């Protein structure tokens, strides 16, 4: 149904994207917790 290369790229990018969003949110949380606005 889907090309193996395309499915491989999607399966490879999804965890990286989720991890990137998690790390970004964590860094923003730490930055907001340590610094005053």
From Swiss-Prot:
GO cellular component, one term: cytochrome b6f complex
GO molecular function: electron transporter, transferring electrons within cytochrome b6/f complex of photosystem II activity
Keyword entries, A-Z: Chloroplast, Electron transport, Membrane, Photosynthesis, Plastid, Thylakoid, Transmembrane, Transmembrane helix, Transport
Keyword Iron: no
Compartments reported by the entry: Plastid, Chloroplast thylakoid membrane
GO terms of biological process kind: cytochrome complex assembly; photosynthesis
Pfam families (UniProt xref): PetG
Membrane topology summary: Single-pass membrane protein
Stretches that traverse the bilayer: 5-25
Family: Belongs to the PetG family.
Subunit and partners: The 4 large subunits of the cytochrome b6-f complex are cytochrome b6, subunit IV (17 kDa polypeptide, PetD), cytochrome f and the Rieske protein, while the 4 small subunits are PetG, PetL, PetM and PetN. The complex functions as a dimer.
Function: Component of the cytochrome b6-f complex, which mediates electron transfer between photosystem II (PSII) and photosystem I (PSI), cyclic electron flow around PSI, and state transitions. PetG is required for either the stability or assembly of the cytochrome b6-f complex.
Name used for this protein in its record: Cytochrome b6-f complex subunit 5
Lineage: Eukaryota, Viridiplantae, Chlorophyta, core chlorophytes, Chlorophyceae
Gene: petG
């Amino acid at each position: 149904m889907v090309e193996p290369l395309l499915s491989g790229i999607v399966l490879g990018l999804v965890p990286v994207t989720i991890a990137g969003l998690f790390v970004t949110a964590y860094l923003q949380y730490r930055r907001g917790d340590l610094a005053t606005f």
